[in-house]
Each structure stands twice: as C-alpha cells, then as structure tokens.
A protein has these predicted regions:
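Short intrinsically disordered, low-complexity coil segments enriched in acidic
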Residues: 1-4, 158
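Residue-level signal for mature regions of secreted extracellular proteins and peptides
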Residues: 2, 14, 26-29
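Short linear/disordered segments characteristic of secreted peptide precursors
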Residues: 8-9, 14
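Low-complexity, intrinsically disordered or signal/transmembrane-proximal segments
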Residues: 14-20
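HIT superfamily nucleotide-processing domains
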Residues: 20-171
Length: 171
C-alpha cells in the first residue's frame, strides 16, 4: 500500500495486522472491525494517530473518511488534545475537497452505528446528487446526476500533504 511519494504506508500495515476487536456494548463482541482490519478506502494521507481515505463511491467523488487509528468508539474516548488534532485533520480534508470539487455543500458526519470505530465522513454534496437534500444514506431522490469534477487520488493526496502541517506524517 502506498500513501504518498512512493512510500510504504506503515500505518496501514500496522492496522492491517490487527484481526479482531472486542467492541463491548455495541453488540459486536468478537466480530471483526472493518476499520481495524482494512484501510477503509484508498489511503491518501496517514499519521500515527489517523488516516484519510478516499471512499470508492462514483456517486460521490471526493467522499473521504478520516479514521482514528486506535480502536475507540466515541470522540469523548479521546483526550482533548487528540480530539483537536483529529478535527484539524477533518477540517483540512473538508478544505481540500471544497477547493478541488467545488460542491454546493459539504457534509461532515460521525455516526459509527454500523462500524463503531471512530471515523468521520467528509462528503461533498451537489443539489442534483442522488440523495440531495437527504443524507447520502437516505432515500434516493434521482438516478442520474450530472457529472461532477473528476480529481485523481494523487491530486487529492498532494493537496492534503500541502494543507496538513508539514510536521504531520504522510506515510
């Protein structure tokens, strides 16, 4: 797995080596946590504490997830400085996606109902996308939205590298 500039993403390899998480209180004890065993998408940027992945959803180009590396369920499970650090990454991703994709609106969501592993969805929205004004998990409103800007994973990766602080790890 390559994160950026041809470097092996050691963070993903560490995450990939985990196989099971006991997710107490979520009805998933002993089941596999998808975000502990997979990257959750194409890795665009990674640090020791979190990673940014591109979600493969042709209806929502630019849809990214910011995934906390350690298996925790809620924002309140983090220390205040960790929360701030995670949100700084979420806001950086939002800034880059807005700049590159020029959506009508951005949605930020942290649900975790199906995957109780702390992660944020950063979703560009257009007035004519499949679900607008519903959330992307809601009822489909239309079948054929107009084409939206095509931006490569490499372009997103480079823009994220510039947006996030140079002292942050990139792979």
């Amino acid at each position: 797995m390559v994160c950026s500039e041809g470097m092996t993403c050691s963070i993903f390899l560490q995450v990939q080596s985990l196989q099971y998480c006991d997710i107490l209180g979520a009805g998933m004890t002993g089941k596999i946590c998808e975000l502990c065993t997979t990257a959750g998408g194409t890795v665009l940027w990674a640090s020791p504490t979190c990673r940014v992945v591109l979600v493969d959803d042709p209806s929502y180009p630019g849809f990214c997830r910011v995934v906390w590396t350690a298996h925790v369920r809620e924002m309140s499970d983090l220390e205040p400085a960790q929360r701030q650090s995670l949100m700084n990454v979420v806001f950086a991703v939002e800034t880059v996606v807005r700049s590159l994709f020029t959506p009508d609106k951005m949605n930020l969501a942290s649900l975790g109902n199906l995957t109780p592993h702390l992660h944020w969805h950063v979703i560009p929205r257009w007035h004519d996308d499949r679900h607008f004004p519903e959330p992307i998990w809601g009822n489909v409103q239309r079948d054929a939205p107009r084409p939206h800007p095509a931006v490569s994973a490499d372009t997103l990766r480079q823009a994220l590298g510039k947006q996030l602080h140079p002292d942050e790890h990139q792979g």
